[in-house]
């Protein structure tokens, strides 16, 4: 999204979670979501940190959605190609590692953790 304000969560929080939920229901494989924005609003990060969605029939789902700034995504994406490591597993592993601390951290700290993970993983796949 191009939004950077607190409106970001209001405009994108529900549709992104709904789309990921729909994909989970439609595909018999793991589903991961990336939310990309110029800058991630803290309230948006908090929405995805919880990652809860109720599908039809009040079926509770825990969604795997990680918010990344465009710069964070660019850094990781470019590093995969520079390191000749452009594989979907690297993006999946980035998402999974970013999620490891979401239940232990509040949104501001989780956003800092995500930044640390992006920097470390980008260096790793690039071979720096």
Locations of regions flagged by a protein language model:
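Catalytic core segments in nucleotide and nucleic-acid processing enzymes
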Residues: 1-115, 121
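N-terminal, leucine/charged-rich tether regions that mediate assembly and partner docking
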Residues: 119-128
């Amino acid at each position: 999204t191009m939004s950077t304000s607190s409106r970001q969560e209001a405009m994108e929080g529900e549709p992104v979670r709904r789309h990921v939920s729909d994909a989970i229901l439609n595909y018999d494989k793991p589903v991961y979501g990336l939310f990309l924005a110029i800058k991630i609003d803290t309230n948006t990060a908090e929405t995805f940190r919880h990652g809860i969605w109720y599908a039809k029939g009040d079926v509770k789902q825990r969604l795997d959605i990680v918010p990344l700034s465009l710069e964070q995504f660019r850094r990781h994406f470019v590093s995969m190609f520079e390191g000749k490591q452009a594989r979907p597993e690297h993006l999946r592993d980035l998402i999974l590692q970013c999620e490891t601390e979401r239940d232990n951290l509040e949104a501001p700290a989780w956003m800092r953790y995500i930044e640390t993970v992006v920097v470390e993983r980008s260096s790793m796949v690039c071979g720096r």
